[in-house]
Regions:
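Extracytoplasmic
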Residues: 12-183
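Beta-propeller blade signature
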Residues: 1-7
Length: 183
């Protein structure tokens, strides 16, 4: 859910899609966040619509949000599946004040790197080398010092195969790798 704003005529303006919902501001720039809160998700060829006939076949190259158990199961874990070369997951917004490291939790069958940027064009980014060949969730991390302030985070997979993205963790000097919230 996003906060709605009225214009001077009393009409509602279109709300920006964010990962914050009704948080009334950016999310804290440290801690563990599940990939399912992505507000942007697209493949190398753009976004896909799943309200078309036979979306599984039509959009087989696109990432999507799914879960590991049936609907209604309280223990189901949601994640982004099928991230292939060029796939992007975007999250808005975080108040990042003292970043030191960023970690990601993945599984699947892929070899490449995850680029992390505060812009969707990835002109400046940090790179996390990854190699997975298992359905077991694995962690990868790198230093993060270039992103500060009220920032979006975009994750772009570049490589071979297909990976699943479960969560990411932002670390600062104050909480350097206290992994109590990880799976």
């Amino acid at each position: 859910a996003e906060k709605l704003v009225r214009d001077k005529n009393g009409d509602f303006l279109q709300a920006e899609m964010t990962s914050c919902g009704l948080n009334d501001g950016p999310l804290k720039g440290e801690g563990v966040y599940e990939a399912r809160i992505a507000c942007n998700l697209w493949s190398k060829v753009g976004a896909g619509r799943y309200d078309v006939g036979n979306p599984g076949k039509l959009l087989k190259e696109h990432p999507y949000i799914t879960q590991d158990k049936k609907d209604g199961d309280a223990t189901a874990r949601q994640y982004i599946a099928n991230m292939r070369d060029g796939a992007v997951a975007g999250f808005k917004y975080f108040e990042i004040t003292d970043p030191t490291e960023i970690g990601i939790c993945l599984n699947g069958n892929g070899n490449g790197e995850m680029l992390v940027s505060n812009t969707a064009d990835f002109k400046e980014s940090v790179h996390i080398p990854i190699s997975v060949s298992s359905q077991k969730w694995q962690y990868f991390n790198t230093e993060l010092s270039e992103i500060h302030g009220n920032a979006a985070l975009y994750f772009k997979y570049e490589g071979e195969g297909s990976i699943n993205f479960f969560q990411f963790e932002l670390k600062s000097e104050a909480n350097l790798w206290d992994s109590s919230d990880r799976i």
